[in-house]
């Protein structure tokens, strides 16, 4: 899939990965076990400020954006009130990148407030390894996967979802 969109005055004719580094000010302490929910609430509530993005948010489909965790990592198990952290959001959708860039810098929830957004396009290069500090999240009506699925079934589901995402993204079938 190739796009030709303007983003900060740059015209590209290739698939771009847009990265937004959002500086966040914490309005209250957030225990590590609540962090992903707080971050998801921050991003989701920003999406829901726009009528057309509400249906995008509520649709059961691939969103083609990812959200990291706060940086710097806290050695303790609590992210501290009155501290500034960085949240990284990435997407391949230029319109979504522009929206996040404009909205997240002034957005706030009860737990955090966006201050600034730094934008960049990730340089193209061969990927030699993939690592993450954010786990894979698999939503299911049955709840947490370990209560109803073996490790082999979980790995098969992850692979199947990856193939579906690739097919959806490229328009090809593998």
Annotated model-derived regions:
Residues 2-174:
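RNA-interacting cores
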């Amino acid at each position: 899939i190739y796009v030709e969109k303007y983003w900060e005055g740059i015209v590209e004719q290739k698939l771009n990965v847009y990265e937004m580094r959002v500086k966040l000010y914490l309005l209250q302490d957030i225990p590590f076990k609540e962090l992903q929910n707080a971050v998801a609430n921050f991003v989701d509530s920003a999406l829901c400020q726009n009528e057309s993005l509400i249906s995008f948010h509520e649709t059961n489909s691939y969103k083609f954006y990812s959200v990291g965790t706060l940086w710097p990592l806290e050695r303790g198990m609590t992210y501290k009130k009155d501290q500034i952290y960085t949240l990284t959001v990435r997407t391949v959708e230029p319109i979504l990148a522009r929206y996040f860039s404009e909205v997240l810098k002034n957005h706030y929830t009860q737990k955090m407030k966006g201050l600034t957004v730094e934008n960049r396009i990730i340089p193209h290069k061969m990927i030699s390894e993939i690592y993450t500090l954010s786990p894979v999240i698999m939503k299911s009506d049955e709840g947490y996967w370990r209560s109803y699925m073996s490790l082999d079934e979980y790995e098969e589901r992850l692979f199947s979802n990856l193939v579906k995402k690739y097919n959806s993204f490229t328009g090809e079938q593998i």
